């Protein structure tokens, strides 16, 4: 499968898997998906962001940036049956976000797995209270926002510019 087609599949799989995971595991419906992509220098991010590297036929960074209210709701639902020690809420909240992203991206691998090539994933890296991600040289941000009643999550892919045309569409 060409690399450019694989990127389009990564985007589609990530959106579909995020939507289904939110609905099935947390009973949180995704109202709509908005699109924002481009050759911007700085990406504004929300209160908690989890970044995973996807390697193999295509190398991308995938950053899930959660609004505080949404990550709080996810955290509460994930830890409902756990005694969270006082003062450890932020640690557990970050761990919950990392687990959510890890599960979503892990589930995505079956959607774009090639028989002859493996797919490598990095563990999630958590950014708390960061405000921006600086664009790397020769990279493009492709962003989608999933809106829920509890806030939104931005899903940002960071990939090399040669995979996109001058209008920042995937080159197939």
Language-model features and meaning:
Residues 1-172:
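N-terminal auxiliary interaction/assembly segments of multi-subunit proteins
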């Amino acid at each position: 499968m060409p690399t450019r087609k694989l990127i389009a599949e990564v985007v589609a799989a990530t959106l579909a898997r995020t939507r289904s995971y939110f609905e099935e595991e947390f009973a949180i419906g995704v109202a709509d998906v908005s699109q924002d992509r481009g050759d911007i220098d700085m990406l504004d991010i929300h209160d908690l962001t989890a970044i995973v590297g996807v390697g193999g036929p295509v190398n991308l960074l995938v950053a899930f940036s959660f609004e505080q209210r949404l990550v709080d709701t996810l955290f509460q639902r994930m830890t409902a049956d756990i005694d969270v020690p006082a003062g450890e809420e932020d640690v557990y909240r970050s761990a919950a976000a990392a687990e959510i992203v890890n599960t979503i991206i892990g589930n995505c691998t079956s959607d774009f797995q090639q028989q002859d090539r493996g797919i490598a994933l990095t563990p999630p890296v958590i950014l708390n209270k960061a405000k921006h991600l600086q664009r790397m040289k020769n990279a493009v941000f492709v962003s989608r926002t999933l809106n829920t009643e509890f806030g939104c999550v931005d899903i940002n892919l960071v990939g090399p510019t040669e995979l996109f045309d001058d209008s920042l569409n995937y080159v197939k």
